Amino acid sequence: MKTSFSRDIKITLVDYDSGNLRSVTQALGFAQIKPIVSGNPADILSADAVILPGVGSGNSAMQALRRKQLIEPIREFITSGRPFMGICLGLQLLMDFTSEGETECLGVVSGTAEHLPSGVKVPHMGWNTVKIAQPHFIF
């Protein structure tokens, strides 16, 4: 399979004390990519691509992003149009809000990340149907 992807790309893996950095770094290593693991805004803004991992609660993750002054650099990077990936909680943080503590998130995608209903197996893995309520530039 051919790809136009360059392994020389500068990928910043955002370190904000709420991410599964080791597993993401290891996964990238299988593709022979060594990310820059950093909580420095300059490393985010100068990256070719950014990955925002996440484990835990949206409330504590947003507090950590705020404390490390990473909210605006992440928003600026996303609006630049360069590749950005949120993994697990990192993806949920792109929403306007999370129902965990009714926390304001990054506001890149309109909506609220909701708790799964009781009785649903967690972690919830598998295929689901995604319904787009309105057009958005990332879809």
Regions flagged by a language model, labelled:
Residues 1-7, 44, 79, 112-139:
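Amide-donor transfer/coupling interface in amidating biosynthetic enzymes
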Residues 11-33:
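N-terminal beta1-alpha1 ligand-phosphate binding loop
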Residues 47:
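An anion/phosphate-binding loop that grips the pyrophosphate of nucleotide cofactors and donors
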Residues 56-128:
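Cysteine-nucleophile active-site neighborhood
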